[in-house]
């Protein structure tokens, strides 16, 4: 590579392609929309365990082209995945039918983004994984029907064992 920026862009493209494969493979055989969200959070935690918390800040500050690729991934690919999950959850009657899909999908993407914001959640005080789990609980309890909330409890009970 002739310059570091090109290397970072190539690595970002590779990481995004890898994440899309991990997401798609992880969703194979999931039982329902609630389970799918738990799998997505597990995949996100797996990715975070191998990621320096300052990576996103550094990308944004020093590598704007690579940051733009990540933003596009988040705003288009992840947004569609969240939207699909919401539609599935409503069809399965685990999510409330009256939610505004576009608003809730965009809110979820912003929640994930916010979890990485060290100005909001300092890594000295909270692990990113802990923040994502709390935000996911808040998100799920807000969109789920009684039937869906029972599933949340079931999945949490299983994961504690």
Can you name each region flagged by the protein language model?
Residues 26, 55-59, 119-122:
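Secondary-structure edge/capping motif, primarily at the C-terminal ends of alpha-helices
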Residues 10, 14, 21-54, 105-108, ...:
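Hydrophobic alpha-helical connector segments
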Residues 34-35, 73-74, 91-107, 125-134:
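All-alpha amphipathic helical-bundle segments outside canonical DNA-binding/catalytic cores
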Residues 84-88, 92, 122-161:
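C-terminal peripheral helix-coil segments that are non-catalytic and often amphipathic
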Residues 1-10:
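HTH DNA-binding helix-turn interface
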Residues 43-51, 77, 111-118, 138-146:
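Phosphate/oxyanion-binding loops and surfaces in catalytic or ligand/nucleic-acid-binding neighborhoods
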Residues 49-84, 91-103:
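Short secondary-structure transition hinges
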């Amino acid at each position: 590579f002739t310059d570091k920026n090109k290397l970072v862009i190539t690595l970002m493209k590779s990481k995004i392609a890898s994440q899309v494969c991990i997401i798609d493979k992880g969703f194979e055989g999931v039982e329902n929309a609630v389970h799918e969200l738990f799998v997505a959070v597990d995949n996100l935690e797996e990715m975070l365990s191998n990621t320096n918390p300052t990576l996103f800040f550094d990308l944004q500050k020093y590598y704007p082209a690579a940051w733009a690729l990540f933003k596009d991934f988040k705003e288009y690919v992840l947004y569609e995945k969240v939207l699909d999950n919401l539609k599935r959850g409503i069809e399965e009657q685990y999510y409330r039918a009256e939610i505004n899909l576009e608003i809730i999908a965009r809110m979820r993407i912003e929640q994930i983004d916010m979890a990485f914001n060290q100005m909001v959640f300092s890594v000295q005080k909270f692990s990113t994984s802990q923040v994502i789990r709390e935000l996911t609980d808040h998100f799920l309890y807000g969109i789920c029907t009684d039937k869906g909330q029972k599933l949340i409890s079931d999945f949490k009970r299983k994961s504690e064992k």
